[in-house]
Amino acid sequence: MLRIAQALDTQLREAMQRAFPDVDALLDPQLAPANKPEFGDFQANGALPLAKPLKQAPRLIAGAIVEALQADPAFAALCLEPQIAGPGFINLTIRPERLAAEVSARLGDPRLGVPEVQSDAAVVVDFSSPNIAKEMHVGHLRSTIIGDSLARVLEFRGHRVLRLNHVGDWGTQFGMLITHLKQVAPETLNRADAVDLGDLVAFYREAKKRFDEDEAFQATSREEVVKLQGGDPVSLKAWGLLCDQSRREFQKIYDRLDIRLSERGESFYNPYLASVLSGLKEADLLVTDDGAECVFLEGVNGKDGKPLPVIVRKSDGGFNYATTDLAAIRYRFALAPDGDGARRVIYVTDAGQANHFAGVFQVAKRANWIPEHGRLEHVPFGLVQGEDGKKLKTRSGDTVRLRDLLDEAVERAEADLRRRLEEEGRSEDDQFIEHVAGTVGLAAVKYADLSQNRITNYQFSFDRMLALQGNTAPYLLYAVVRIAGIARKGGDLEAEAGMLQFSEPQEWSLVRELLKFDAVIAEVEEELLPNRLCSYLFELSQVFNRFYDQVPVLKAEGQSLPSRLALCRLTADTLKSGLGLLGIATLERM
């Protein structure tokens, strides 16, 4: 009901100005959704803060506002008579015919009443970001699916979204890995398919062990890094092959999860690192400390009480993550052709990186690399834990590979489906079972994560996420199938424009819940919390169930039949759209 809320807010402000033309204070109606259905649809609390400047009782002030409101024909066409409650709250109820008109407008509208923003400025969403030569593991799950969902919501709102994958494709680790492979398996550096990612990970572990224990190997590895940074063709070819091999494996995961990303790794920003230092120097922020060049943070002190530094060049002359992140921020906000021209940059990483980003963001702001009204945001998330409350691991104590986790989810979904089909005496072919199990399994993993407040840790449980009851993906997928089936049974019967008729309280509850969709999308866009959308979809399914259980639909008479079928269709469309914004595909049958 965003359009209605915006119209009401304008009408209230104008009424307050007419009622109190001499008040210098800001006239804010403080309009918000009503806390309880008996209070109407909205509540305006703006009379209370005016009591002191006007030296009047809030109820008298509310009465004057209501009187001015009722003189406005546009308000009279929108709302029933306002009610003053408590110390001076104004309760507002939207006219039933206006609510019915809003439902009618959303029927067949693919946007379901969600307005599009009018802006060409890019929004960058930086998410997933695995490391080359390492397999994606459960730790990449949250960044990947939270980032994808936020990107989908922002795109739906009409933003030009850059989905960037800031892969770890540069640094000392490549020097040691290339050196190790040259010595023990040179054939792996001839072509990208000479080694699979699992073997590459094993080689990486061997290289790391040698690097930690062998000073000669360490020195050779550092020489290899210098060659790589200097553009040595042999080193660059080896590096490119390693990146290609990892990239192919990452893409298999992304394709499976229906994730779209544009890779722009750390190496992309190499040409811009020197200018980061010169820019910080020009801004008079750069300080040399123990041979390292850094920026000391304001308001962030260490245990010794001294300001903490953000090091941008180490004492050995090398750059680090902070330098690369500063170069990325500068590039992303810079106008084309020098950058992306973004006005909002969102980083989706684990909460453990919060201090790092807080420091880097402060430096970027003090260097004036963030344009006026530019937004730089860190979207932190907690850990994925096992049911024992500890970090999710395999039985052997290793990190869970993301591929294995997804495989198990699909296998368990298939086992559940086959068991249910047997209990129901249904026979389905393997193609149907494979499709449904694949959809449900991946949906369950995504929804279990997205339905949690991302800031907290959450316990991973296949049993809970695959349950057909409760706030789960299988429950919502089944709700879509069921509701769409009810609508189909109604055939092509549709209510004529302007002829929707609702009389039962269960109908009005469903109408009001359906009309919240645009406000929920706006909230997710602003707060970057996908769990708000999950909570809404689950509540919508619950409200629909009460409506369908208590009010006849297919046996309804007169204009009630097409009107109630319209509610079924709009509910199915809203659930499908909402799940789609979470990256979850729906099914025709289960």
Swiss-Prot record:
Q: Any idea of its EC number?
A: 6.1.1.19
Q: What class of enzyme is it?
A: ligase
Xref: CDD domains: Anticodon_Ia_Arg, ArgRS_core
Any one GO MF annotation of this record: arginine-tRNA ligase activity
The record's catalysed reaction(s) read: tRNA(Arg) + L-arginine + ATP = L-arginyl-tRNA(Arg) + AMP + diphosphate
Top-level lineage group: Bacteria
Q: Which Pfam families match?
A: Arg_tRNA_synt_N (PF03485), DALR_1 (PF05746), tRNA-synt_1d (PF00750)
Q: Which GO terms describe its biological process?
A: arginyl-tRNA aminoacylation
Question: Where's the motif 'HIGH' region?
Answer: 130-140
Indicate where this protein is primarily found.
cytoplasm
Q: Which GO terms describe its cellular component?
A: cytoplasm
UniProt KW keywords: Aminoacyl-tRNA synthetase, ATP-binding, Cytoplasm, Ligase, Nucleotide-binding, Protein biosynthesis
Q: Where in the cell is it found?
A: Cytoplasm
Q: What InterPro entries does the database record attribute to this sequence?
A: aa-tRNA-synth_I_CS, Arg-tRNA-ligase, Arg-tRNA-synth_N, Arg-tRNA-synth_N_sf, ArgRS_core, DALR_anticod-bd, Rossmann-like_a/b/a_fold, tRNAsynth_Ia_anticodon-bd
Indicate the family of this protein.
Answer: Belongs to the class-I aminoacyl-tRNA synthetase family.
Q: Which NCBIfam families match?
A: argS (TIGR00456)
Description of how the protein assembles with itself and partners: Monomer.
What is this protein called in UniProt?
Arginine--tRNA ligase
Please report the organism this UniProt entry assigns to the protein. Answer: Synechococcus sp. (strain CC9311)
